[in-house]
Swiss-Prot record:
Forms a complex with importin subunit beta-1. The gene is kpna2. ARM repeats lie at residues 109-151, 152-196, 197-235, 236-280, 281-320, 321-362, 363-402, 403-447. This is Importin subunit alpha-1. It comes from Xenopus laevis. Keywords: Cytoplasm, Protein transport, Repeat, Transport. One of its GO terms (molecular function) is nuclear import signal receptor activity. SMART domains: ARM. PANTHER family: IMPORTIN ALPHA. GO terms for biological process: NLS-bearing protein import into nucleus.
Amino acid sequence: MPTTNEADERMRKFKNKGKDTAELRRRRVEVSVELRKAKKDEQILKRRNVCFPEELILSPEKNAMQSIQVPQLSLEEIVQGMNSGDNENELRSTQAARKMLSKERNPPLNDIIEAGLIPKLVEFLSYHNNSTLQFEAAWALTNIASGTSDQTKSVVDGGAIPAFISLISSPHLHISEQAVWALGNIAGDGPLYRDALISCNVIPPLLTLVNPQTPLGYLRNITWTLSNLCRNKNPYPPMSAVLQILPVLTQLMLHEDKDILSDTCWAMSYLTDGSNDRIDVVVKTGLVERLIQLMYSPELSILTPSLRTVGNIVTGTDKQTQAAIDAGVLSVLPQLLRHQKPSIQKEAAWALSNIAAGPAPQIQQMITCGLLSPLVDLLKKGDFKAQKEAVWAVTNYTSGGTVEQVVQLVQCGVLEPLLNLLTIKDSKTILVILDAISNIFLAAEKLGEQEKLCLLVEELGGLEKIEALQTHDNRMVYHAALALIEKYFSGEEADEMNALEPEVGNDAYTFQVPNMQKESFKF
């Protein structure tokens, strides 16, 4: 259940009747401020270079893979060797330290830091006449920077940023790649170090590496590092940096490798997770159609960030949303609302909820593309988080849609699953549902079919559920439920409803409808 602050923020940004259009779309609320660990469907913040028992190390001198024996040394021996001033001892000790830091489980990062070895490792990065030592030091520092924020800080404080940026241009490809990897870990720590890297002019040398001659594995690392430079907000990356990186991301979006596509789409999702001006910069690249193509991908690692990016775009202006509609987003959303993965259902419903916050012509395009039926199905039997997004979609739709559009949604069977969700514990979602029900009643009033809607709500068990909310702990829920009952289910309305009590015919309910043609009923 969302926190009060999170839910209030969401309600504040939710489309309401009479509000300015800038308030009509909701932004993604990020609940957690702590660093997320790698999930299967989320991009990795930091990565360690892990070694295996039979080590293969690229020898810069021979440009070939060689099996090497790394000595087992104690930490004390490593400290002595790295400070010995003897080239051979420095290399052996640095390799031993790197091996310690490359253990798959529980590498002793803090032991190495507390031994005061970081300044020496950074110094070794400048040993251009000993590329093997450079590489080993770069690898060791990469793994320290892959740790906690404090561990990354120790690498930065040791002066590693300018040293690694210098190594991007190393003539030895594997050293250059290790430097890019380390910089990706530093950028992934958060906006402070991301901006420190940008201030040190990291972007131009990185961009020169994106060319047809770059090996695939290396290009994957570069793409991941570029995506980390686009990541994080509070503050967002400087717009000048975004404009530098975007043309290269545009090229990478056309690549065929799934890892490169995944990281490029994540970069796009970060760049669109902000103000309308930031969304506009991405929309103007002409990439929206390509993003929507990637939403058809069977690879979850590509589908998730491309859907997130398009979802961010439709939080923007009506014009930006229309760009996504024109590129075909409404054709792919039905299958995503029925996706086997609940997280995809939720993201698709979130995107749809923001499209539904648009003007009636955009809502009509939703109807034309067959989105009402999968939306109602999701309300009926989706994962709870996806159902909550579907509720927002329905409420936005009923707020901005025409009477005829609201009628079409009701005819698709939206009322029953909507009313059934009134028994959940989430107060804010209940309020959103009550808002949708109120909107549907307003449409019924305009058609003169309020009484029939009252009967339908009662027949579906909705009146009982709304009445039960009058004892709800949340005062806003209590007042909203009471307002609905007093307006539509009491006094004269109740008498009129009784007069319309359905009689059971041979195969259906029939209504006693004085002075009205049955054909006029639309619900």
